[in-house]
Curated annotation (Swiss-Prot):
The keyword Thylakoid does not apply. Keywords: 4Fe-4S, Cytoplasm, Iron, Iron-sulfur, Metal-binding, S-adenosyl-L-methionine, Transferase, tRNA processing. Residues 413-475 form the TRAM domain. It comes from Gluconacetobacter diazotrophicus (strain ATCC 49037 / DSM 5601 / CCUG 37298 / CIP 103539 / LMG 7603 / PAl5). Gene3D superfamilies: Methylthiotransferase, N-terminal domain (3.40.50.12160), tm_1862 like domain (3.80.30.20). The gene is miaB. Residues 178-410 form the Radical SAM core domain. Transmembrane segments: none annotated. Residues 31-151 form the MTTase N-terminal domain. [4Fe-4S] cluster 1 binds at C40, C76, C114. [4Fe-4S] cluster 2 binds at C192, C196, C199. GO terms for cellular component: cytosol. PANTHER family: CDK5 REGULATORY SUBUNIT-ASSOCIATED PROTEIN 1 (PTHR43020), MITOCHONDRIAL TRNA METHYLTHIOTRANSFERASE CDK5RAP1 (PTHR43020:SF2). Belongs to the methylthiotransferase family. MiaB subfamily. This is tRNA-2-methylthio-N(6)-dimethylallyladenosine synthase.
Length: 480
């Protein structure tokens, strides 16, 4: 049986009004901005920040590229054939740009994100109609790039890793990233120093860098003032956070989480993505001591084979991961885990794959993401010998996902008949239905009053579906 806490720390119902700067209605004569976002939660956050930094230039969000004076395509380099997907989308946007040009309207087209960082020159060679190419570390320079693009005959490209940190120059966040602002993402760390053999992140996002504590707390308070009840802290390697604190010392993620938990109105804190090597004793203790820190942790392991973990340059063994899980569960018995797995890394044998399946059986995951290995140009694994055949990778992925699906179903089954605190974020698909999330990020649907949106209330889970739960309210009002 899955153990549950029936209540969480819940903030006062009355939230302070969102500051006047949040008046985001477009001014007369303003210009439309359409942002297309692919990839991770950090890209969602980055897109919001690019929107913020362009507001002083008169740009406001619009729903379609056809009505936009500027279009930003914020890209992701993680998936296979990521660059080709970008060029396909750029072909569509070229038609939009040309159609607007026939009507005497200009469209500034920008490509941002990790594909822009990795393929900047190739983008301009194959898509010369693109006006701006910028990497993830130069968003604070976007207004300057727009001005340069207006003056220049050619495109502007900025994919440097500048000495200054962009967060020192970006304005405070202006808009939440979800309808109603009940949940928000907050980037606190970027880059990675681990150099896993399969991963492009160190090359596209750069070295690990952390925002100062004061900057993080200021933005978090603003999010809460604007209605956020839950904040997810983001970073490529978020538990490596080492920001400068107001006391002049370096703060780790545990100390930052403690400070965030003290913000009135912030009921839930999450963080992603973590590396096992940076899950220190202080952070484990924070899961024990901070009720606002949700008992659901995404902790990628990638493989259960020590030989493959070494080939991946993960810096830990399968036994290290198992021991870490035991320490987490000892500190927080109700914690649940999700993870990432890659099948078919170069050199992976049947025995290596079986070791991964055994680790999954031993640990037990509430959720997981799994992928076939695909080479990323410039990474060590791309040129490694003993590449695994595609049909073998397909079979292994199918077997692994079947095991993970069984575990996810079992975890969700364990909630049926139990009372779970649910943060309601909006309406469900059916009339009179509300939708929210459990502490374990499970979607939960109930019938209830709109007054519960933005609040936490107890729900008795009655039924489990493939990817969601349904139940009935135990109480008709939020608890404090």
């Amino acid at each position: 049986m899955v153990r549950r806490r029936a209540q969480e720390v819940s903030a006062v119902t009355d939230q302070p009004a969102c500051p006047p700067a949040m008046d985001l209605a477009p001014a007369s004569g303003s210009r439309g901005l359409h942002v297309i976002t692919w990839g991770c939660q950090m890209n969602v956050y980055d897109s919001a920040r690019m929107t913020d930094v362009l507001r002083p230039l008169g740009y406001h969000p619009v729903d379609t590229p056809d009505t936009a004076d500027m279009v930003i395509l914020n890209t992701c380099h993680i998936r296979d054939r990521a660059a080709e997907k970008v060029f396909s989308e750029l072909g569509r946007l070229r038609l939009v740009k040309e159609a607007r040009a026939t009507e005497g309207q200009q469209t500034v087209l920008a490509v941002a994100g990790c594909v822009a960082q990795a393929e900047g020159k190739e983008i301009l060679a194959r898509a010369p109609f693109v006006d701006i190419v910028l990497g993830p570390q130069t968003y604070h320079r976007l207004p300057e790039m727009v001005a340069r693009a207006a003056r220049a005959a050619g495109a502007v490209i900025d994919t440097d890793f500048p000495a200054e940190q962009k967060f020192d120059f970006l304005p405070d966040a202006q808009a939440p990233q979800s309808p109603g602002g009940i949940t928000s993402f907050l980037t606190i760390q970027e880059g990675c120093d681990k150099f896993c053999s399969f991963c492009v992140v160190p090359y596209t996002r750069g070295a690990e860098a952390s925002r100062p504590v004061a900057s993080v707390l200021r933005e978090a308070r603003r999010m809460v003032e604007c209605g956020a009840r839950e904040i997810t802290l983001l970073g490529q390697n978020v538990n490596a956070y080492h920001g400068e604190g107001p006391d002049g010392r370096v703060w780790g993620l545990a100390r930052l989480a403690e400070a965030l938990a003290a913000i009135p109105g912030l009921a839930r804190i999450r963080y992603t993505t973590s590396h096992p090597r940076d899950m220190d004793a202080d952070l484990i203790a924070a899961h024990r001591d901070l009720p606002a820190l949700m008992p659901f942790l995404h902790l990628p392991v990638q493989s259960g084979s020590d030989r493959i973990l070494d080939a991946m340059n993960r810096g830990h063994t399968a036994a290290d991961y198992r021991d870490l899980v035991l320490r987490l569960r000892d500190a927080r018995p109700d914690i649940a885990l999700s993870s990432d797995f890659i099948v078919g890394h170069p050199g992976e044998t049947d025995a290596d794959f079986e070791a991964t399946l055994q680790l999954i059986r031993d640990v037990g995951f509430a959720q997981a993401f799994s992928f076939k290995y695909s080479p990323r140009p410039g990474t060590p694994a791309a040129g490694a010998p003993l590449q695994v055949a595609e049909d073998v990778k397909d079979a292994r992925l199918q077997a692994l996902q079947a095991l993970l699906r069984t575990q996810q179903d079992a975890f969700n089954d364990g909630t049926v008949g139990h009372v779970v605190p649910v943060l309601f974020t909006g309406h469900g698909r059916k009339a009179g239905q509300l939708s929210g999330r459990s502490p374990y990020l499970q979607p939960v649907h109930v019938e209830g009053p709109d007054s519960l949106i933005g609040q936490i209330a107890n729900v008795e889970i009655r039924e489990r579906y493939t990817n969601s739960l349904s139940g009935t309210l135990v109480q008709e009002r939020a608890f404090a």
